[in-house]
């Protein structure tokens, strides 16, 4: 081909390319911003780290689901401290007397107690040898000799008193019961020469042996019953047979 023929073709190609670039550049300005370069989307990156927990929200309303079954009861907790005492309540009304089909219970209890006391006294009497009874008195002796104070204590232990004859019959019973001298419940310790019983009463019956009482050596303030049945004053510190009288 002739160089002169190819030159026009070359110019035509340059013009066509220049026109095409001009048109493309104008279209690009219509679709892409002038600052940001247009390109195809990139590949998604990895997820970022979790952010910090936000503030706790308010309690929501119960859901509309079915309520679950009640759980089993828990273990008993430790007992609490005792509470303060309450104020006294109002006084109640007086109740009706209770029924007592067997009689008055208080009377029955009193009789039972009296019977028990009497049985106890009888048991104590058994500790003595068999005694003698006259009228409403029972005279008993344990056969032991001791001072007057010990005789008083012994008789008092058995709810009795030292034997004190108030008449000839009682004096004879005591005489037949003992075979040796026995203390009687008679003294003049308070007032010399004025013999009284242990309750302080003056004697209405006496059976002094001849020449008695003589208060020998000024120390004979107690009285014994002799084997003959007569009375004699002796020192209270001397030892003689113990004999007690019990009311029956």
Curated annotation (Swiss-Prot):
InterPro entries to which the protein is assigned, alphabetical: C-type_lectin-like, C-type_lectin-like/link_sf, C-type_lectin_CS, Ca-dependent_lectin, Collagen, Collectin_CTLD, CTDL_fold
Any one of the GO CC terms: extracellular space
Post-translational modification note: Hydroxylation on proline residues within the sequence motif, GXPG, is most likely to be 4-hydroxy as this fits the requirement for 4-hydroxylation in vertebrates.
SUPFAM superfamilies: C-type lectin-like (SSF56436), Triple coiled coil domain of C-type lectins (SSF57944)
Residue pairs linked by disulfide bridges in the UniProt entry: 155-244, 222-236
GO terms (BP aspect): complement activation, classical pathway; complement activation, lectin pathway
Superkingdom of origin: Eukaryota
C-type lectin domain: residues covered: 134-245
The keyword Secreted appears for this protein: yes
Start and end residues of each Collagen-like domain: 42-99
Domain notes: The coiled-coil domain mediates trimerization.
Protein name from the UniProt record: Mannose-binding protein C
UniProt lineage: Eukaryota, Metazoa, Chordata, Craniata, Vertebrata
């Amino acid at each position: 081909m002739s160089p002169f023929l190819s030159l026009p073709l070359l110019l035509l190609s340059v013009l066509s390319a220049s026109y095409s670039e001009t048109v493309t550049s104008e279209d690009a300005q219509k679709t892409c911003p002038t600052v940001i370069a247009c390109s195809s989307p990139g590949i998604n990156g990895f997820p970022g780290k979790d952010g910090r927990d936000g503030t706790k929200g308010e309690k929501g309303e119960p859901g509309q689901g079915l309520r679950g079954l009640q759980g089993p009861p828990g273990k008993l907790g430790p007992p609490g401290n005792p509470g303060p005492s309450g104020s006294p309540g109002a006084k109640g009304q007086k109740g009706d007397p209770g029924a007592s089909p067997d009689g008055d219970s208080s009377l029955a209890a009193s009789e039972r107690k009296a019977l028990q006391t009497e049985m106890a006294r009888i048991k104590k009497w058994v500790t003595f040898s068999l005694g003698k009874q006259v009228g409403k008195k029972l005279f008993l002796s344990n056969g032991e000799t001791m001072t007057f104070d010990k005789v008083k204590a012994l008789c008092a232990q058995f709810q009795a008193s030292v034997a004190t004859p108030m008449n000839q019959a009682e004096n004879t019973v005591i005489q037949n019961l003992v075979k040796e001298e026995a203390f009687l419940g008679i003294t003049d310790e308070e007032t010399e020469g004025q013999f009284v019983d242990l309750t302080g009463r003056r004697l209405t019956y006496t059976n002094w042996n001849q020449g008695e009482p003589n208060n020998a050596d000024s120390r004979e303030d107690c009285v014994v019953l002799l084997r003959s049945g007569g009375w004699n004053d002796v020192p209270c510190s001397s030892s003689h047979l113990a004999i007690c009288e019990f009311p029956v």
